[in-house]
Amino acid sequence: MLFGKKDIDLPANDLLYLLGDAPASRDWSWIRYGKGTDEWITGINLFNLPFEAGLNTNTYKYYIDFAARFGFDQIMLDAGWSDARDLFRIQPGMDMEELTRYAREKKIRLMLWTLSSTLERQLDSALNLFNRWGIETIMTDFMDRDDQEMVNFYHRVARACADHHIAIMFHGAYPPKGFNRTWPNVLTHESVLGSEWNIWSELPTPDHNVAIAYTRMLAGPLDYEPGLLLNAQRDQFRPIGKNPMSQSTRCHQLAMFVTYDSPLQIFSGNISQALLEPAFMELLGSIPTTWTDTKIIDGKTGEYIVTARQHGDDWYLAGLGGSTARDLEIPLDFLGAGDYEATICKDGRNAHNYAADYSLERLTVNGQVWLKIHLAPGGGFLVQFRKKQS
């Protein structure tokens, strides 16, 4: 059980991480973190293309080009790139040799989805194949248990991946609770009701999203996969299969990339839609996934949270709001001395009706400033602070 004097004492608590066994004494310097794209949540429902979108080489080259343009490190090849029961039976129309060559040329990494039972059966041979392709990260899915036999599977797979210098994300998984300390190549666990639930349910509400920061996040990195670009207020929302929307504003989706802790972040938005808004995507693409300092500035469980995270000399400030609109006044004293160029992305004047509405502005600030921000219902904001050279 974790304790804090205030709600905001809990989200940055790392006790469960520290309770994990220390990692084995081996070289972990090969591990790389970053941001990737996912195509499964939006059903590869792309547009403005000269080819038919789907599980084919041209589509994934399109994702690679997008990632390279907007500062992403990798793209996901989610379920379907191979037969779920045989990782060596590649989907017709997918030329993996060409895709891996093209990805290397563009300096983008490929991340592969696997079915956990298949990965276990083909573990060594599959990891050898992934090494030959230059794959550095995989996802394995549908464990859906936490008995001792399954816990042993997690350790067995993490160890084998480490031996092959491959990082891994566990989906359909129990929370890490220090597992990522024991195995640093285990970047994140899903273990959360995240973006994909917008496809078929009304469960990922703004209040739910805020509550995650005070509950699930305490157990370690989580893979929510935010970034849906079709946004709606609660009374406008409905699940729409391959064209999913969020029950929150565009800026609420953006703020999750800083609010939620995960050294591997996955953008789930439709990249054809994202290409129409380059300024927004350049800001999203700039967000780091690892941090040197974290401060929870303000918040109340299930209602809202304001988080500041530092990466090098720069800071990112994010606010995630529940279903009730609110006005915030946020001290910037965490910035310390000097001036910063602030890029502010916040709910637009009409976000209470049109949830995709947002505004972008830039100004110079310092640690003496208080920032005033209005959150629409289901709202959010993100501020990037870049240190100005004196």
How would you name each of these model-derived features?
Residues 243, 252-265, 271:
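Catalytic domains of carbohydrate-active enzymes that cleave complex glycans
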Residues 1-106, 379-380:
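Conserved structural scaffold segments of CAZyme catalytic domains across common CAZy folds
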Residues 78-249:
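Aromatic- and carboxylate-enriched substrate-binding clefts and catalytic-loop regions
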Residues 344-368:
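Solvent-exposed beta-strand/loop surfaces of large extracellular or lumenal domains
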Residues 269-316, 352-356:
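Glycan-recognition and catalytic regions of carbohydrate-active enzymes
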Residues 300-341, 381-382:
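Carbohydrate-binding surface patches
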Residues 362-390:
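C-terminal beta-strand-rich structural cap/linker in extracellular carbohydrate-active enzymes
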Residues 67, 141, 168, 259, ...:
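Conserved, mostly hydrophobic/aromatic
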